[in-house]
């Protein structure tokens, strides 16, 4: 399973690891994914979503425009 949030579609960010002598090496900054249990359609579903999506879910519902472009597979 790839490290992508299914609600916000966030992916990893490509950055540099910079040493004291300013040598730069490529590295990836991964999304902060957490397992979250959500009650949808009269059943509990466990999703691995980003912490940004968890904060948004606390303030809005899944029916919101925010998640209209999300790739929710079988919800």
From Swiss-Prot:
Q: Which domain of life is it from?
A: Eukaryota
GO MF, one annotated term: structural constituent of ribosome
Disulfide bonding pattern of the chain: none
Which InterPro entries does the record match to this protein?
Bacterial_rp_bL28 (IPR050096), Ribosomal_bL28 (IPR026569), Ribosomal_bL28/bL31-like_sf (IPR034704), Ribosomal_bL28_bact-type (IPR001383), Ribosomal_bL28_sf (IPR037147)
Sorted keywords for this record are:
Chloroplast, Plastid, Ribonucleoprotein, Ribosomal protein
Keyword Transmembrane on entry:
no
Q: Which SUPFAM superfamilies match?
A: L28p-like
Q: What broad class describes the main subcellular location of this protein?
A: plastid
* One GO cellular component term: chloroplast
Localization per Swiss-Prot or TrEMBL? Plastid, Chloroplast
Name the GO terms of the biological process aspect. translation
NCBIfam families associated with the record: L28
What's the protein here called?
A: Large ribosomal subunit protein bL28c
Species annotation: Cyanidioschyzon merolae (strain NIES-3377 / 10D) (Unicellular red alga)
């Amino acid at each position: 399973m790839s490290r992508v949030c299914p609600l916000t579609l966030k992916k990893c960010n490509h950055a540099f690891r910079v040493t004291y002598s300013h040598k730069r090496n490529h590295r990836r900054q991964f999304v902060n994914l957490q397992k979250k249990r959500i009650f949808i359609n009269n059943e509990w579903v466990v999703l691995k979503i980003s912490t940004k999506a968890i904060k948004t879910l606390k303030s809005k519902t899944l029916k919101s425009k925010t998640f209209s472009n999300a790739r929710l597979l079988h919800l």
